[in-house]
Amino acid sequence: MVEVEHWNTLRLRIYIGENDKWEGRPLYKVIVEKLREMGIAGATVYRGIYGFGKKSRVHSSDVIRLSTDLPIIVEVVDRGHNIEKVVNVIKPMIKDGMITVEPTIVLWVGTQEEIKKFEEDAIAERQ
């Protein structure tokens, strides 16, 4: 049986368009670089194949209907205080999109040594 502990971890999702830019560069790349600079645990970028946003315009990767602005999701899981810092830095970059944050439970991350350090940090954080 897996023992689940609350480590105050959050999942941050940033929903943007593939064509969104920041200072002329793809926004999703700028965000990931900024996350890395900030020492965030990790980030993954997902490219949507079909979807629509608040304007109800459908974006599709179908060959027949090739969209040039597919949905992009940047996902991050880290401790709450790190996610809060990220939101404060990233939010001004988002001109059209959505940011969500939700609690998440991390069951496994990395090597045994990394897990031990993660657990020790979580315990110290509570004190």
UniProtKB/Swiss-Prot annotation:
InterPro entries: N-reg_PII-like_a/b, N-reg_PII/ATP_PRibTrfase_C, UPF0166. Disulfide bonds: none annotated. It comes from the Archaea. Belongs to the UPF0166 family. This is UPF0166 protein PH1503.
